[in-house]
Amino acid sequence: MFMADAYFADTVWYVGQIIFIVAICLLVIIVVVAFLATFKLCIQLCGMCNTLGLSPSIYVFNRGRQFYEFYNDVKPPVLDVDDV
């Protein structure tokens, strides 16, 4: 009878260890997934800042340069005027 109780206690201890290991693994997985989700959100926010801030600036710069080049192409040349 005593031996059966000892085996039962060992079995409960092993099952407890397995449950503990599984719980730790699940906790680690949850923490890693939360970290990766946070990292992904930061990357998306940086992309949004790029879209809202940098891209319009580049567009305005390029359009301004195009207008400047167009103006220089269409303006009439300076006429040579004799000194009066």
From Swiss-Prot:
Keywords, comma-separated and alphabetical: Apoptosis, Host Golgi apparatus, Host membrane, Membrane, Transmembrane, Transmembrane helix
Keyword Cell membrane: no
GO terms for biological process, alphabetical: disruption of cellular anatomical structure in another organism; viral budding from Golgi membrane
Annotated InterPro entries: E_protein_bCoV, E_protein_CoV
Residue spans, topological domain Intravirion: 40-80
Bilayer-crossing regions: 19-39
All ranges on the Virion surface side of the membrane: 1-18
Membrane topology per record: Single-pass type III membrane protein
Domain of life where this protein originates: Viruses
Keyword Zinc: no
One Pfam assignment: CoV_E
Cell compartments where the protein resides: Host Golgi apparatus membrane
GO cellular component: host cell Golgi membrane; membrane
Entry function: Plays a central role in virus morphogenesis and assembly. Acts as a viroporin and self-assembles in host membranes forming pentameric protein-lipid pores that allow ion transport. Also plays a role in the induction of apoptosis.
Assembly notes: Homopentamer. Interacts with membrane protein M in the budding compartment of the host cell, which is located between endoplasmic reticulum and the Golgi complex. Interacts with Nucleoprotein.
HAMAP family reported in the protein's UniProt record: BETA_CORONA_E
Protein family according to the UniProt entry: Belongs to the betacoronaviruses E protein family.
Protein name: Envelope small membrane protein
Organism: Bovine coronavirus (strain Mebus) (BCoV)
